[in-house]
Amino acid sequence: MYDFSGLKALFLNGTLKKSPEVSNTEGLIEASRKIMEKHGVKTKVIRAIDHHIAPGVYPDMTEHGWNIDEWPAIQKEVMEADILVIAGPIWLGDNSSETKKIIERLYANSGELNKAGQYAYYGRVGGCLITGNEDGVKHCAMDILYSLQHPGYVIPPQADAG
């Protein structure tokens, strides 16, 4: 059995359902989370809709007219994770608005550099989980995985599930 102790994975849930409402996306996250934890990975789940995340493409939208923006605290969690999984439902054949907002906000920090002068997301692993009863899982996964690799995440083969 593989041991990945020391690695941290963060699941960002783009469901449109506020806690404690049951989310099918949360159910799929839990299945993936159990597999990771079985192999020693520490995991955390953040349900985006439960937070006041301002839309936009700047690291802190309170500097651009918004009264509240909880993204900077979430971004700190993103940077502490070795693995980032963006999860969300399909609505009308596309990713949910919350999932798209997560991607926008990740991109807002894409210009930051690490200590080696590389993009801050460089060398981290990305993946996605998609739920829904509509066609379009591969399309939604394609959008998310491209959005992760563009700023530096490594996307391994078959890094999506739906």
Briefly describe each language-model feature range.
Residues Y2-S5, A9-N13, G127-L129, P157, ...:
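Ligand-binding pocket scaffold of soluble enzyme catalytic domains
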